[in-house]
Amino acid sequence: MHTTNNTQYSWAGSREMCLDEVSVKQYGDIVLGKYGGNISAGAKKNEDGALVWSNGDWEFTVILDGHNSAESVDLVVSTIQAEYENIKVIMNELIETVFRSVENHMLTIFQSSSFKEKCKRVKGETACLICVRKENYIWWLSIGDCLVYVFHDELHKLGQYTLNQRQFYEWIGNVNTFDLPVPCYSSGIRELRTGKNRIVMVTDGVLECGERRYETPLNLYSDMNKNNIELKENVHNILEHVHHQLGRDSATIISWDYENDAYATYPSDQPEKIKVKK
């Protein structure tokens, strides 16, 4: 079920902390879950952030995890928010060029002298993960240690879950990867499988609490696909688990489903599965 209306929402944990509180809301097709941390474990701030845009034809999402203040999160969210009209135009491009264009646009912004000057003036820095889905493809740009997964039964059977790898010494902000002689980040594009693809983005607070259940991707896959319940309820249950595991760090989840009716790629020795998209 896709919305036809444009959906725009952005959030920074400094404005709505959700300490000891799980908040799960839906914006268009996209579910956003927030949890600020367990007060009894010492949680007293939320430095995560998120931005979600969708219009039925595509989704553009950003998840952030700030360090040493939320100022860098506010800066990145407001900077991307100001680019909405430009990005909306880019998202109307043909599938052959759209991901290259959106990546070039984001890198141009992050490497601009004006943005880098603003970064020098903020306290702290942030991890930042951007994901874009259009048609049967997903693109991501990752700075730092947030993760994005694509959950699908075919991929699950082969043990494939994450799109990116966590990088623990990359940030945007006062310490800024885009100030290096060679900026460090990862990006990529994946074809989505035929049928239901569940896209899940998380900050490290989901992974690094208590027994660290969700550092094992299979556990996150299992709990995000439990009992045929609504996506919102799965997200809520995972953040409740973080709370009961005395998670001190804030935990944020962005998730949505994409039902792909296009044929996906198979190897040449499985001719019965190979079909050409008309």
Regions found by a protein language model. Name each.
Residues 1-278:
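PP2C/PPM-type serine/threonine phosphatase catalytic domain
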